[in-house]
Amino acid sequence: RLPADSISLRTDTRVRLHHGSGHWPARIVLMEGKSLGPGEKQLAQLRLEKPACIWVGDRIVIRNWPETVTLAGGRVLDAHAKNKNLRTAAQKIFLKQRAEHHTDASKWIDSQINRDGVGKRDGVLKPSHFYPTEIQMTVDDMIASKELVQVGQWIVKVDIWNNLRTQCASEINKAHQEHPERIGLVLEQLRPLVGSVFGQQNLFEELIADLE
């Protein structure tokens, strides 16, 4: 958010990002529009010129390049964002959900699984400003409430996993009906279907185990 007594901040402005006792040069890229007016707030990406150790959820301060004026304050919503994905619909939904619920671990976990389709149980929201015990308890609660399901080392949205199981079971039944003389469907034929849902994440073995 830009303070009410500030001047407008234009996209691609070179600034200094302050976090704790450190500061780093960066360029600020606004997600929408070319400038941010006084008192306004907006999602933006900071493209750092040097690596920085900042966790997801941490508060930051943005100062002008000469470091004479504080321009804005903010919170890190995605520490590993890719430039090419900045304005995609999935990334916008992901960032807005986190911005609107910055202290709710369940919303942050949900935002990641919604965007990526899957997450590692022991890696979700790590590192971040949420305590590890809080993250694990939140995941447990989301599994207990049938929002998520754990398959092997992964956590997945229950409806997505169930839909995938149903599709795979349908393909197996179809193969039995069309070719009753065969033992069954070659399970490797299901791999592309799993890949279409989870992309590069390999949950094929977990799915086969769940179908047995």
Locations of regions flagged by a protein language model:
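C-terminal effector modules of nucleic-acid-centric enzymes and ribosome-associated factors
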Residues: 1-212
